[in-house]
Amino acid sequence: MRLEELKRLQNPLEQVNDGKYSFENHQLAMDAENNIEKYPLNLQPLESKVKIIQRAWREYLQRQEPLGKRSPSPPSVSSEKLSSSVSMNTFSDSSTPDYREDGMDLGSDAGSSSSSSRASSQSNSTKVTPCSECKSSSSPGGSLDLVSALEDYEEPFPVYQKKVIDEWAPEEDGEEEEEEDERDQRGYRDDRSPAREPGDVSARTRSGGGGGRSATTAMPPPVPNGNLHQHDPQDLRHNGNVVVAGRPSCSRGPRRAIQKPQPAGGRRSGRGPAAGGLCLQPPDGGTCVPEEPPVPPMDWEALEKHLAGLQFREQEVRNQGQARTNSTSAQKNERESIRQKLALGSFFDDGPGIYTSCSKSGKPSLSSRLQSGMNLQICFVNDSGSDKDSDADDSKTETSLDTPLSPMSKQSSSYSDRDTTEEESESLDDMDFLTRQKKLQAEAKMALAMAKPMAKMQVEVEKQNRKKSPVADLLPHMPHISECLMKRSLKPTDLRDMTIGQLQVIVNDLHSQIESLNEELVQLLLIRDELHTEQDAMLVDIEDLTRHAESQQKHMAEKMPAK
């Protein structure tokens, strides 16, 4: 009875124990993963040490290959210590792929081909040759188990680890330097070296003097997602192996100089930058850029004084130019005011309506012409004798007073005889200055008053002298049409009585008249401009002569009391 109860209770107890053990195993696995994720910095040195031990084991297998045929007994190693350290390479991480996909199975390391591993380590020292899962034909015992092969090794693990690291680090550095020497001899100076193969795990940097520490320990610590560089987007990962993107070969010297100072006697110390200058390495991997020398200090006070002096000079030049323009504009305004007084005040004090009536015919006023900005200095060339006479004696000044009136006398010759004008000019010699001025102004007023009716009479004479329209010959029974054409007014009733041919003749005649009138208008406009220029010249001459005459009169009046 008791045996049955014991057996019956033993089954649930075994089940409970199995469940408890499985739960504890699962909890231990979860704790291991959590510790790996929480403390990623501690795994990187172990991983590098495991790789070094793995290479040492391959080298040992290669050395023991000839001895294995005679004595196939492998050296004994503490399986618990070595297997635990080797198995750290395949730690469980959720984001890290399994190294077994690339053939990095530590259990099959013993069965890898020794010749292929040695050849790959010599050809490219920066590569970790993936282990093949196939059995090597050269191995005497086939695939060897790493744990079972190293059971009886009595040397402590830390001592063995240190010895292996010290043994392999100089060899790797020597192989790296030999490889770089070969690249330099081949002229390998490409700006961007090709990416390493998928089997590459570590990106080494060549040490300056060939120190006793491997460059793989200088790698940055891995992050939980398995990438070696946390912020480097150029790190690639193929099948769980890290492939560092290619970098320019010319920048290896400066990078090594930054990571580790080079000794003075290093044989590769010449590859760094020059000793006299500072070489800055750009982040994109370009060529070394020497630092520019500092800019010399500026003397800001002297510069400000120089600028202030330049501004003061510019201001003085502007003030002088403005003063000149103001003086010239004042002189021009004074002369224009005098001309306006002479034209409007003295000529038309009694009858300003005469000039205004003349202006209605389309002729611009004198004041507007004087203010139109015409160059009046050219007008002095028209009558240069007046200037010469004004500088002469009193008798010559009296004769010069008659010179501006010569065009007036020519203009008035149509309605007065020359004898009368000559007698009047002779009688002016005996008159006083004021009386002569008044008489000349009266003559000018009369000439201006006679200008408009004389112009109308001349226009009527020109109209009568024109040829009759050829329409009068085509339309003898309609004489009024030719008159209407001359007056440029036709009635619709007259046009209805005409044929198409007659209308075409009238149209052609009108076109020809328009062309002839346009040509005549152009000629008349040119004549008008010339007359305006001549009139302005006369006014300027009158102004100058009036001033000169007044000065002479004052001079004579001062001499008379002195006598």
Swiss-Prot record:
Cellular component per GO, a single term: cytoplasm
- Residue span of region Disordered: 63-150, 164-295, 312-336, 384-430
Composition-biased stretches (Low complexity): 76-87, 108-143
Compositional bias (Acidic residues)? 168-182, 420-430
Q: Which domain of life is it from?
A: Eukaryota
- Keyword Phosphoprotein tagged: yes
Taking the record's annotation, the residue ranges forming a coiled coil are: 500-534
Major localization class: other
Give start-end positions of Polar residues composition bias. Answer: 88-97, 318-331, 400-411
Which spans does this entry mark as compositional bias, Basic and acidic residues? 183-199, 229-238, 385-399
Which stretches does the entry tag as region Required for interaction with ankyrins?
419-563
Q: Which residues form the IQ domain?
A: 47-67
- Indicate where the modification Phosphoserine is found in the sequence: 193
Q: Does the keyword Coiled coil apply?
A: yes
Question: Quaternary state and partners of this protein?
Answer: Homooligomer (via coiled coil domain). Interacts (via IQ domain) with calmodulin; the interaction is direct and lost in presence of calcium. Interacts with ANK3 (via ANK repeats); required for localization at axon initial segments (AIS) and nodes of Ranvier. Interacts with SPTBN4. Interacts with KCNQ2 and KCNQ3.
Describe its function: May play a role in action potential conduction in myelinated cells through the organization of molecular complexes at nodes of Ranvier and axon initial segments. May also play a role in axon outgrowth and guidance.
Q: What is this protein called?
A: IQCJ-SCHIP1 readthrough transcript protein
Ranked from the top, the taxonomy reads: Eukaryota, Metazoa, Chordata, Craniata, Vertebrata
